[in-house]
UniProtKB/Swiss-Prot annotation:
Subunit description: The cytochrome bc1 complex contains 11 subunits: 3 respiratory subunits (MT-CYB, CYC1 and UQCRFS1), 2 core proteins (UQCRC1 and UQCRC2) and 6 low-molecular weight proteins (UQCRH/QCR6, UQCRB/QCR7, UQCRQ/QCR8, UQCR10/QCR9, UQCR11/QCR10 and a cleavage product of UQCRFS1). This cytochrome bc1 complex then forms a dimer.
Extra information: Heme 1 (or BL or b562) is low-potential and absorbs at about 562 nm, and heme 2 (or BH or b566) is high-potential and absorbs at about 566 nm.
Keyword Electron transport among UniProt keywords: yes
Protein's UniProt name: Cytochrome b
Cofactor binding notes: Binds 2 heme b groups non-covalently.
GO biological process terms, semicolon-separated: mitochondrial electron transport, ubiquinol to cytochrome c
Molecular functions (GO terms): metal ion binding; ubiquinol-cytochrome-c reductase activity
Lineage: Eukaryota, Metazoa, Chordata, Craniata, Vertebrata
Function description: Component of the ubiquinol-cytochrome c reductase complex (complex III or cytochrome b-c1 complex) that is part of the mitochondrial respiratory chain. The b-c1 complex mediates electron transfer from ubiquinol to cytochrome c. Contributes to the generation of a proton gradient across the mitochondrial membrane that is then used for ATP synthesis.
Gene: MT-CYB
Organism: Oxymycterus iheringi (Ihering's hocicudo)
Amino acid sequence: MTIMRKNHPLLKIINHSFIDLPTPSNISSWWNFGSLLGICLMIQILTGLFLAMHYTSDTATAFSSVAHICRDVNYGWLIRYLHANGASMFFICLFIHVGRGIYYGSYMLSETWNIGIILFLTTMATAFVGYVLPWGQMSFWGATVITNLLSAIPYIGNTLVEWIWGGFSVDKATLNRFFAFHFILPFIIAAFALVHLLFLHETGSNNPSGLNSDSDKIPFHPYYTIKDLLGILLLLMILMILVLFFPDILGDPDNFTPANPLNTPAHIKPEWYFLFAYAILRSIPNKLGGVLALILSILILATFPLLNSSKQHGLIYRPITQVLFWVFIANLLILTWIGGQPVEYPFTTIGQIASILYFTIIIILMPIANMIENNILKLH
């Protein structure tokens, strides 16, 4: 078996990726989230496939087909809530994974990092089109508001919006194409994830110390397979607690009402994992400015390798940047909270301050902290 594992054309790839892969001996539990994202993607594809067998992407029957899945299909309620809450777990793992990359300086593996940003954007697109499918009030109005933002693009904006809608409003054509996108995108994510791994294994993993670990590597299996298995069990436990005890805690009550173009909900808001970006979008009074800020709130991650001038890898021995990092995380939580609040004082003001701080920390404060820390190093 050992010889076959190392010589067989297909098994050889699996062997070099998951079994005999030389891995730093000191990577902590923060490195578990990559494998957890893989598991989340598998759960989403499997549950999504079974949901697609019973779902109908027609404005007249979409809402009732979801109700039918929950009521009449064997374990349909379980599949549906695994899929809905699985998306939340996916994003929790995604945010922690990106946060770990920022904290430990993994962005210096620039190809892996850039593919990761593409993965992040693709996952956000998938979640957005997926949220439209149940055709509840928030699905419909969320789709209307967010797709309408494209009209802010000069000259081609309005044409682009109508092209995406497939008509003059969000209707049957929109729902149909969103279902098609939602079905295909996870497979594109899976393909990008393989490229992500390919680039990662080209350079080898980073580690908490930020030092070169070539002299101290251990095989991935059994050490990290067991460690990942523990993470997977914890993830599944949290997911099952959510699904079986609090299935609707992260959903919006408005989505239990069928979509009605004549009745606008009091507060239109996306799922919780988009609220930080939604708060940044709303904090700018100008439509085009808001759209640009929304896009930049994600694309700004690409500036991390460019703006980093530190002589050290990661933040483990950099107290000033460490403080900034945790202020950044707190600010992100504030933005998430603001995104779910109505557009009125004091929420708008807090949102504007938090949005400015979001960009200021990354573009101005962190590079300054880098220079200060480099100078402190020279003193010693």
